[in-house]
Amino acid sequence: MTLAPSIDHMADLAEKAWAGLPEPFRAAAGPVVIRVLDFAEDELLAEMGIEDPFELTGLYHGVDLTQASVADPSPRPAEVFLYRRPILDEWVERGDVTLADLVEHVLIHEIGHHFGLSDDDIHDIEDGRR
């Protein structure tokens, strides 16, 4: 019997995805903390107007690089949250992608927000890669 991928397993996939990104990309991003949780907190979902916790697979939290200032540095590094259960749910529903590829996709999407890109910008970039 195979067990469902754990938070630690998904964190390992995310770290491998991060390490596999081109060095210039990682250097430009600067310090980014990757956190894996089962779900987003209820308060966050309420703030975002999301009723179904399975709708949020990832979240960028921090000051995007277009807003960052040397004169007023952020007291905390940027954080990317990956939500295990929604990612697993999407992975099972899709059935056409590996879990590692889906984790990488969500991670890159959220890092795109770190660079100040909108969802539309990120989708345009992804469409150009296909």
Show which residues each predicted segment covers.
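Active-site rim/adjacent substrate-binding subdomains
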Residues: M1-L102, H114-D121
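Catalytic glutamate of the conserved HExxH
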Residues: V106, E110-H114
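Short, highly charged C-terminal tails/helix-capping segments
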Residues: D120-R130
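Acidic-residue sensor for enzyme active/binding pockets
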Residues: E79, E110, E126
